[in-house]
């Protein structure tokens, strides 16, 4: 099972001007660090002007249904370095490969501004994708509840465990 830890640091202070961010979420890559278990921890920062990042556990109907494209709102698309070129590798659950997709929980902004600025920390399990190529990275994208899609960030390259 994949574990997702969301820590949100809201910079909403009464003495400071309220932050103004676009309503479309924006990501900034922070880290892609190895863990003792052989996996990696992905850390990205995000901003969102209208404060609608994250899904409630009950968000499983309509566009968030389990078989719908937006059931997972954080997607980490797997790539391998092959012959000097980054190559997207489709991970199909029907063949036993599990995509690196996550449901970021909702964090309701506090204060008078709906704007959000926070950090997402994702514990990614060790991956055992067979093949002759040993270097990987992920393309990371976030969707908010309004289905606005963030910019895409790339993790640092890493050697397979």
Language-model regions: role of each:
Residues 11-14:
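C-terminal motif of bacterial Sec signal peptides marking the signal peptidase cleavage site
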């Amino acid at each position: 099972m994949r574990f997702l830890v969301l820590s949100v640091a809201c910079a909403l202070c009464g003495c400071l001007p309220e932050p103004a961010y676009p309503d479309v979420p924006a990501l900034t890559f922070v880290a892609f660090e190895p863990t003792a278990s052989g996996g990696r921890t992905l850390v990205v920062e995000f901003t969102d002007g209208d404060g609608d990042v994250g899904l409630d556990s009950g968000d499983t109907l309509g566009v968030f249904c389990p078989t719908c494209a937006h059931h997972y709102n954080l997607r980490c698309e797997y790539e391998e370095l092959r012959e000097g070129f980054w190559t997207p590798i489709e991970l199909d659950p029907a063949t036993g490969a599990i995509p690196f997709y996550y449901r970021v929980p909702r964090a309701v902004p506090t204060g008078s501004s709906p704007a959000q600025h926070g950090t997402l920390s994702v514990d990614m399990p060790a991956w055992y994708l067979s093949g002759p190529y040993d270097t990987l990275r992920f393309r990371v994208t976030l969707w908010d509840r309004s289905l606005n899609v963030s910019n895409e960030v790339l993790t640092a390259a890493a050697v397979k465990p």
